[in-house]
UniProtKB/Swiss-Prot annotation:
Binding site for Ca(2+) 1: D73, D75, D77, K79, E84
Function: Potential calcium sensor.
Residue numbers spanned by region Disordered: 26-55
Higher taxonomy: Eukaryota, Viridiplantae, Streptophyta, Embryophyta, Tracheophyta
Pfam families: EF-hand_7 (PF13499), EF-hand_8 (PF13833)
Name under which the protein is recorded: Probable calcium-binding protein CML41
MF terms (GO), sorted A to Z: calcium ion binding
């Protein structure tokens, strides 16, 4: 009987979680439009301009991924090594062993050269079934990222201060007011903070 594929350690997912969050926050912030505009076009017929916009959106997303990839690839050789992955973790105050870094890379290293190429990186950032078991994985990684944004661990919420603090660690400098605005956009109950449900909504829109 085939054994179930072992799921990797939570440390190996911090890379995926934090970088996905950085990508989503920055990219969604740029592409966001007023809600009235989005509702007025909800039932509009599909047009050529819609197709062009979709193509441009895909290209922009790819360019954004390239920028994130370059942030990891410190020596510019087109590959992310375990050393470079560890260096990134250190820059955000997280220790990760060389073994754990290599494990994270091996999970999606298609050519088995021990490092992560750009296409492997794109695959990682767009995959939903991380373990190949037919299940859509996501909450585990999102919860890990959510916890990293909590100012008070276990509080169950992300405040503007917590968002600002973590974005600085990720190299995304934002004012307190900007962080308030980002939270307000996804704050369903209007209490000025994000709970996990609202955080998931932000990440999957």
């Amino acid at each position: 009987m085939a054994t179930q594929k072992e799921k990797p350690s939570s440390n190996s997912f911090k890379w995926f979680s934090t970088k996905t969050l950085k990508l989503n926050l920055s990219f969604q912030n740029r592409r966001r439009s007023p809600k009235s505009n989005s509702s007025s076009t909800l039932n509009s017929p599909r047009s050529n301009s819609d197709d062009n916009n979709n193509i441009k959106s895909h290209q922009a997303s790819k360019e954004e991924l390239r920028q994130v990839f370059s942030h990891f690839d410190s020596d510019g050789d087109g590959k992310i090594s375990a050393f470079e992955l560890r260096h990134y973790f250190g820059s955000v105050g997280e220790y990760i062993s060389h073994e754990a870094a290599q494990e994270a890379i091996n999970e999606v290293d298609t050519d088995a050269d021990g490092s992560l190429g750009f296409e492997d990186f794109v695959g990682l950032m767009t995959r939903r079934d991380l373990y190949g078991d037919g299940e859509v994985d996501g909450d585990g990684e999102l919860k890990t990222a959510f916890e990293m944004f909590e100012v008070e661990k276990g509080s169950g919420c992300i405040t503007p201060k917590g968002l600002q603090k973590m974005l600085v660690k990720l190299g995304e400098s934002r004012t307190y007011g900007e962080c308030e605005a980002m939270i307000k956009f996804y704050d369903i109950d209007g209490n000025g903070i994000l709970d996990f449900h609202e955080f998931r909504q932000m990440m999957t829109v």
